[in-house]
Each structure stands twice: as structure tokens, then as C-alpha cells.
Swiss-Prot record:
Keywords: Cell inner membrane, Cell membrane, Membrane, Transmembrane, Transmembrane helix. This is UPF0299 membrane protein YPO1514/y2654/YP_1404. It comes from the Bacteria. Belongs to the UPF0299 family. One of its GO terms (cellular component) is plasma membrane. Pfam families: LrgA. The chain crosses the membrane at residues 4-24, 30-50, 66-86, 93-113. It is a multi-pass membrane protein. InterPro entries: LrgA/CidA, Uncharacterised_UPF0299.
Length: 135
């Protein structure tokens, strides 16, 4: 029984933290002069809290694992909602495919060049060079 209560507490705490970040993001989105979705701002708040280790990651891990496990199911309503615009999508199918292809190509090129830049060969300079007597 004690183990079950502990598990329930972990899930409750994790979902509460995620929803508090979401609500804070939505409130901040209303105050900002630029249009950024509150859910994105909430994710950024959660990211900052986790990276600065203000919030321990084990506190949100149970709910994150649960949400990731059922992520595909969470996208079903969005897919059904897109079908309302079937006629418009069929009319614009060509430009949609071309823009997806070009944007994917651009992302792949940027990642490739960035990776080559980050992982380029660097000269290793030793702190002291040995002299003839030390060899």
C-alpha cells in the first residue's frame, strides 16, 4: 500500500509540475508582445528549470515516460482534424511536397556543415614541449 501511495505521489507531482510550467507559459504568452504559443514557452520554462537543475529530473520522469509511451495516440485527434481540410490539401499537394522536400534538404545541409565545423580537426598543443635533454 505504501509503495502504491508513493507511486501515485510521484505521478501527481510530475504532472503538476508539467501543468504548472504549461500554465506559466500560457500566462507569459498573454503578456508578451510577440506571438509565441504558451505551450512552447511552457516547454522552454521546463527546459530551463531542468538544465539549471532547479528542478530535479526524477520529479518529472514518471509523467514524461507515460506521455512518451502514448505519444502516437495523442496525435490521432490532430490527424483527424487535418482531414477537415482534405480538399484544400489535395489542391495544394504539390507545393506542400516541394516545401517539405526543400526544407528537409536545407536542414540536412545545415546539420552536415555544422557537424563538420564542430568536429573539425584541431591542433593539440601540449602544455610543455620536451627539450633535447628530457627525451
Amino acid at each position: 500500500m505504501r509503495n502504491m501511495m508513493s507511486l501515485c505521489w510521484q505521478y501527481l507531482r510530475a504532472f503538476t509540475i508539467i501543468y504548472l510550467c504549461l500554465w506559466a507559459g500560457k500566462a507569459l504568452a498573454l503578456l508578451l508582445p510577440i506571438v509565441i504559443p504558451g505551450s512552447i514557452i511552457g516547454m522552454l520554462i521546463l527546459f530551463v528549470l531542468l538544465t539549471l537543475q532547479i528542478l530535479p529530473s526524477p520529479w518529472v520522469k514518471p509523467s514524461c515516460q507515460l506521455l512518451i509511451r502514448y505519444m502516437a495516440l495523442l496525435f490521432v485527434p490532430i490527424g483527424v482534424g487535418v482531414m477537415q481540410y482534405y480538399e484544400q490539401l489535395t489542391k495544394q499537394f504539390g507545393p506542400i511536397v516541394v516545401s517539405c522536400f526543400i526544407s528537409t534538404l536545407i536542414v540536412m545541409l545545415v546539420v552536415a556543415y555544422s557537424s563538420h565545423y564542430v568536429h573539425r580537426d584541431r591542433k593539440v598543443i601540449s602544455p610543455s614541449t620536451p627539450t633535447e635533454g628530457e627525451k
